[in-house]
Structure formats: C-alpha cells, structure tokens
Amino acid sequence: MNDFYVGYVPKMPPGLRVFVRRVVAIIGLLAMAVAAALLLGQMPFAKSTFEFGQVRSFEGILETNPYPTLLVDRPGETESNPKYSRYLLVAPGKHGADTLFQNTNGKRVRLKGELIYRADQTMIEVEPASIRALESVEPNPAPFRSLGEVHVTGEIVDSKCYLGVMNPGMGKAHRDCASRCISGGIPPLFVTRTGDQFLLVDPDGRPFPGDALRKFVAEPISVQGELLERGDSKFLKIDLAQLY
C-alpha cells in the first residue's frame, strides 16, 4: 500500500513517481517523433510567386492565339535567343483573358497587372480597366515550330495557380480549384514528372472547350502528342482520346 496515491497528499510515493515520469517522458518523445515524421513527409513549397498588390505597367505586342500573351521586347537579342519575352495573360479570379482582348491581335498595347511566375514561366493578372490599345499594328507573330512527337507522363494543372497564385498548385487537394480555373478560361498546363511545362492545345492548335479536360485534371496521366515551340513557350498538341 506504500505506492497508493491519494490526491490530497502533498507528494506522490517514490515508486509511483518514477513510473509516471518515465511514462510522461516516453509519451513526449513519441509526440516529437510523430511531429517530425509529419513535417518530413510534407511536400516542400514550390519556388513560385504571386506579386499580389504590386501593380506594374507593361507594354508589348498582343498575341491572342491560342492564349492571350504579351510579347515584351527583350534587350540584347541574339540569333540563339528569342526576340520577345512571352507573358501569359489572365483576368482576375478564375477567368481567362480572352474577352479582354477582342480585335487586338497583333497590336501593341499598354496594360497594368500583377506578376505571377515560377521557373522560366511568367504570367500577368491584368487589370481590365488599364488596357490601352495603341495605333501601331505589328507584323504577324512567328509561326509554331514542330519539335516532333513526344510521349510524356504527368498532370494537367491550371497555369495560374500552378505558377504562383496557389501553393501547392497541383495534386488531388487542388483538383476542384484547377477544374474551375480551366473551365473559366485559364490556360491548361501539362506538367511532366521531370518538371517540364507544356501549354495544352487541341489537334487543330486551338484551346480546348471549357469542361473538356475536367475529368483529367490532377490525375496521373500519360499522353502522346506533337510538341510545338513559339519563342520560349512550348505547346503540346493532344487528342483527348489518347489520354490514359
């Protein structure tokens, strides 16, 4: 009965005190081990950025096909480097920018917006009221250059969230958001297992209809298609019947 503890007694019996201390220490160590395992199991945040609230001014040539893109003059042009930096354009929220740039293809425009970027891909979330089309009309943009057929495995994401608005901007947890963004006109992006990024277009080189890609978003898929290049942007021309 020496180790029987009564709550109002000032001190716990020695034997019981040692036992309780050991149990508490073991529980504490287990809790720290579980916390460390959960921390190590988390995916690291991607090095992507959305300059929310930092509005900048831009001027360049507008290219609307297949996705609205601003071509900004690049200093130090050489034979091995493209003449322009290419910035994808999107509207605020889960909306593409197609309706913002009707009848302005090939024109030089001024606009304001916030940068979104990841790796070598850059996007601008445009302030609709800031768009100003200038009088000068530039020559037609460079044609697509075929890089041949490729077979790739990866995931379809919405480019806006993936490039920086959300982190992470891919995976099952982001599926519903990505589906709504793509349905709203945000350019769909195919990200391979090695991190390559290709804008998706249909067999005719045009954007897919709103919900055409919904069931494939955030799923691990493989596809074969023609890889195209225009400037420093790459496009993957695919047939949905060949996705698996």
Segments predicted by a language model, with ranges:
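OB-fold and OB-like single-stranded nucleic-acid-recognition modules
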Residues: M1-Y244
